[in-house]
Amino acid sequence: MINLKKNIKFLITLFILLELSFHSNFVYAAGSSGDDGDGGKDKVSLYKSGKKLVLRAKKFEKKDKIEKAKKLYLKAYDKFEKAYAKDKKNADILNYLGYTLRKTGNFEKAETYYLKGLKLDSGHLGINEYLGELYVQTGRIELAKERLEVLSGCKCEEYEELKELIEEN
C-alpha cells in the first residue's frame, strides 16, 4: 500500500512537472516575435513604446517645455508609424499618428490619419475628439461641431473636453 501511494505521488508530481514544462515552452514560443527589422519589436511593443513617449511629452508640455515635448512626439510618431506598417486596420494606432502630428503642428497630415481611422471606426472616441480639436485649431468650428455631435451620445470625457474647447472659441 505504501509503495502504491509513493508511485501515485511520483506520477502526479511527474505529470505536474511535465504540464508546467509544456506550458512554459508554449508561452515562450507564443511570446517570441523574432527579428522583424526593428530590434524584434512587434506592433504591440511599438504601440506601448509610443504611448509612453506621448505621456512623457505631455508632461513636458504642461511644464511649457514645448521643444522637448515636440521631440518626444516625433519619436512617438516613429514608433506608431512602424506599428501601423504592421497593422493597417488599427484605429488606435491611426489616432496616435494623428495626435502626435497635430501636437507637432502638422495639421494636414494629422487630419489624414484621423480620417483613415474614422473609416475603420466612425465612433472612435479619441479620433472624434482630437479631430474636433484639430478643426478648432485650424478655424473650422462647424466641422468641430460635427465631431461633437458624433460624441454627444456617449456623455464621456471626450465629449465634455471638445464641447468646452468649442465654446471657448
For each of these PLM feature ranges, what is it?
Residues 42, 90, 124, 156-159:
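Residue-level recognition of tetratricopeptide repeat
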Residues 86, 120, 151-154:
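Structural marker of alpha-solenoid helical repeat scaffolds
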